[in-house]
Each structure stands twice: as C-alpha cells, then as structure tokens.
UniProtKB/Swiss-Prot annotation:
Protein name as it appears in the record: Ribosome maturation factor RimM
Key words of the record: Chaperone, Cytoplasm, Ribosome biogenesis, rRNA processing
The encoding gene: rimM
PANTHER family found in the cross-reference section: RIBOSOME MATURATION FACTOR RIMM
Subcellular location: Cytoplasm
Length: 177
C-alpha cells in the first residue's frame, strides 16, 4: 500500500463542465502540463484511501482563470463526471519537473516556519496553499489562528527551504485580519 507522501497533489476537482464528462480542476501546481499533457494521473477521494489510476485524455486552461478543464478516459457524460467532484488529482511524488537555481515547488512551502525577521522567532507554520487569482499561504499560528498571506514577493521576500523558514514583510494590519 502506498504512503500518502508517495503522492503529490496537483489539484482538486471542483466542478463538472458541460454534458460530455469534462471536469474543472483547481490547480495546486505551477506546471500546466500536469493538466494538459495526456497520460496517467491518480485520483484520491475526500476520505483518503488508496489512489486509483485514471488516464488524462486532454486538458486546457480556462481563459482568464486559474482553473483547468480536463477529460479523463471512461468519463463520457455529466453523471460519470459528477462522481469525481471533490477528488484530489495526484501524480507520483518523484514526478517533479526540474527547477532552475532559486526556484522551488509551491507544495514544498507547507511545513515551513514563518518569521517576521530572519533571526526572529516563528509566528506560525505554513499549513496549506490556496490557489486562485493569487496564491495564498495559510499560516497557522501557535495559538491556532489561521492567517491568509498573499504569496507575492513584496510580502514573502525570502524563502529558505533548506533552513525550513520563510520571511514575511506584511503591510500593517494584515496579521490582525
């Protein structure tokens, strides 16, 4: 049985698109080929469990949106597609595109400590990523609050993966929301 860390979540199926079995995927990956290049992918239900393999037939990004529309083999109508809504789209954890120096995979940010100064204490830990118009980091503080921080260079100017932390320079009031 495969462990959960054997898999990399690249998106979540959020809705059906049309009548022919197409599905909308909210990506958790900066690599569009995860949703456009045919080949094997895996699905895992909301309850967890063992992922099941499915073949991606084709995909495209919706113009002006971060969502992708995908077609899977054997999913040819709306009813079949509706059974997949809410599932996580996975690839094997070792299926990671090569990155240039200084680049990183967004999912590698989960678990990093968030600091306000390079040598200061952590104010919390990155607990999730939320994809949308702009990516958001969900940071869970030591008292259990959840902060949503825009993942933009002006607010997150440094990411130190090997050291296990990132630097925040939030505008006044952002941490109080």
């Amino acid at each position: 049985m495969a462990e959960s860390n054997d898999w990399l979540s690249v998106g979540k199926i959020v809705a059906v698109q049309g009548l022919l079995g197409e599905l909308r995927v909210n990506p958790a990956s900066d690599f569009p080929e995860r949703f456009t290049v045919p080949g094997p992918r895996w699905l895992r239900s909301r309850q967890g469990g063992e992922p099941s393999e499915i073949q991606l037939k084709k995909g495209r990004q919706l113009p002006g949106k971060s969502l992708f529309v995908v077609r899977f083999e054997g999913v040819d109508n709306r009813s079949a597609a509706e059974t997949l809504v809410g599932m996580e789209l996975l690839v094997p954890a070792d299926d990671r595109p090569e990155l240039a120096e200084g680049e990183f995979h967004l999912l590698d940010l989960v678990g990093l400590k968030a600091r306000l100064t390079a040598d200061g204490p952590a104010i919390g830990t990155v607990s999730d990523l939320i994809s949308g118009g702009n990516d958001l980091l969900e940071i869970t503080t030591s008292d259990g609050r959840k902060l949503l921080i825009p993942f933009v260079e002006a607010i997150v100017p440094e990411v130190k993966l090997k050291a296990g932390w990132l630097l925040l320079t939030p505008p006044p009031g952002l941490l109080e929301l």
